[in-house]
Amino acid sequence: MPGKLLVQGWRFIHHSYALVAQAHCLSLRRYADIALRFEDLPFPTTAWQQSRGIFLASDEEAIAALPPPETGFVPDVTLQFKGDFSPPPAGRKFTFDTPEVRALTPEARRGFASGAEVPESVHVLTPSRWTAQGYLRFGIPAERVHVVPHGVDPRLLRPQEERRLRVRRELGLADAFVIMSVGAMTGNKGIDLLLRAFARIAEGAPDARLVLKGADDLYASREFLRATLDALPAAERTLVTPRLAYIGERFSARQMAGFLHAADLYVAPYLAEGFNLPVLEAAACGVPVICTGGGSTDDFTDPSFAWRIRSQPIQMRTQWGGVGDGLLPDLDHLTELLRSALAQREQIRAMGAAGAAWIAQRFTWDAVTDRLVRELFADARAGGELGPRPSPG
């Protein structure tokens, strides 16, 4: 019997949950024996507006053409890209969420005092071992907590030297050493640490530039960055500001890939992350990485291309007034790693090439979607009933 899969999520919105849902759906089309349907979830705020141009045009046509569930469609599995423990009408349900501080929001708990109360038909899908701990602590049985990482599109996210040089020229950074970070500029991203570390290395590296990419359409990224700069000591702010470039507009997948290619070094000194997809994407482009050690990125980085910042566990206040887990990266160690990268420019380019090969072998969307299918349809896979279409030729 073919597997029937209902995916519930968002389309054509520049949010990580939407990007992941759509990327998986594109890859799921390879499976001739999965009947795939897509149901749009309402947006959490009227400020969100759909827009095209995020994915490649051919991919967006395929996403738009995903059929909704017809009358009488009874899924074997429902994959919902929203934290919700309510049971499905039929079959099994996998609820996707990324509790970045390893504590579940009141909305996700939605009346359940512990995981022991969550119906057995409800499973959890989450992208890292770090976030999985949040569900295990809540009491969800380990056999119903499934870790499937995110992936990259190798058509776009791979080393491309000609493109790298062109984008650097367009950005006016042809001769600079470009240190880059991408994210919402929220408190968990560690942008204050990055600014302070950059101030420390700025005088000794006159060609270093710090390039930050925010998301002004979904978050107050520019305002947060401005407040963070204002909070710096005046001497540090004077060193950083002339060397800092900020870009907040929405990018398509192709534009984002080009932007990442322009970097010499990608830095993510985060305090708490559910996954941190830009780290994976930068590495896929051949950019060496510095990121917080001990967190979600440990799952998909390797010492051959990523330097991990020493960190210590901390407690973090949540937006809903609770307490969760975080990591405090060591500022001195981050500064030391930045100086090492600046002093070893050819060596870190070789690290970047190693990282691109490592990611391409393990973390394409097709590869991680195959892992997803094994989790969603474990019973059917055991019987050998499911499999992707054979490649043409």
Each predicted region: which residue ranges?
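Aromatic "clamp/platform" in nucleotide-sugar-dependent glycosyltransferases that forms part
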Residues: L271
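A short, well-ordered alpha-helix in the C-terminal region of glycosyltransferases
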Residues: S340, Q347-Q361
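N-terminal pre-catalytic "stem/leader" segment of glycosyltransferase-like enzymes
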Residues: M1-F73
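Extended catalytic core of nucleotide-activated donor transferases of GT-like folds
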Residues: T45-G139, Q255
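Conserved donor-binding/catalytic core segment of Leloir-type glycosyltransferases
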Residues: L6, L173-K189, L195-F198, L210-L212
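Acidic anion/phosphate-binding donor-loop and adjacent secondary structure
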Residues: L136, V152-E170
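Nucleotide-activated donor-binding/catalytic signature segment of Leloir-type glycosyltransferases, i.e.
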Residues: R222-R254
